Design a protein with these regions (language model features):
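ER/Golgi luminal nucleotide-sugar-dependent glycosyltransferases, focusing on the catalytic module
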Residues: 1-178
Length: 178
């Protein structure tokens, strides 16, 4: 933790480290999306950094978004941002990175993580997508396509990106197509 704290200080970034014991039995029964929902609920209820904020960006823990500063400078704090992971599949939203007003998250997304059932193929992405569709929630693409690198916590998938493909996605994102 000391290395991370040093890095945050040198980067002039506020860092808060939260730790809690989630419901391990329920996470095993329902899957990693359930555990992620528990974590987000804990963060929303206990984070000192979020107390004075109206908006947040969530990035999955093992991933780096190389253009996060560029993205956050362009976000409008009254909007909800998700991308779709694959433009040929518009029936699911990407939960590796999303952003929205905190109250919108608390009201519309935080309560539904309990519907996750990995064994039945119902992942957090499905549950959030269902909320968006059923409630008619207006969602925007990120203003710049996220340059994501890292490793998936569930399947060990390695995420990398190609800059030229991201440039094309940047243009397409302006039309809210991703």
């Amino acid at each position: 933790m000391e290395d991370l704290s040093d890095y945050a200080r040198k980067s002039r970034v506020q860092l808060e480290i939260l730790s809690f014991a989630g419901n391990t039995v329920q996470s095993i029964l329902q899957g990693k999306g359930y555990g992620e929902g528990e974590i987000m609920q804990y963060v929303m209820e206990h984070s000192e950094l979020l107390k004075g904020e109206a908006f947040f960006v969530k990035i999955t823990g093992r991933l780096q978004v190389h253009n996060i500063r560029e993205i956050t400078k362009k976000l409008k704090e009254q909007r909800i941002y998700f991308n779709i992971p694959n433009r040929t599949r518009k029936d699911i939203y990407d939960t590796r990175i999303y952003a929205m007003p905190i109250e919108q998250f608390r009201e519309k997304f935080m309560p539904v993580y309990t519907q996750v059932m990995d064994d039945e193929g119902v992942y957090l992405e499905h549950v959030y997508t269902r909320q968006i569709v059923n409630r008619g929630i207006r969602v925007y693409n990120f203003p710049s396509y996220p340059r994501i690198e890292g490793i998936s916590g569930s399947r060990g998938t390695i995420y990398a990106y190609s800059e030229w493909k991201c440039k094309i996605r940047d243009m397409i994102s302006r039309f809210n197509y991703y």
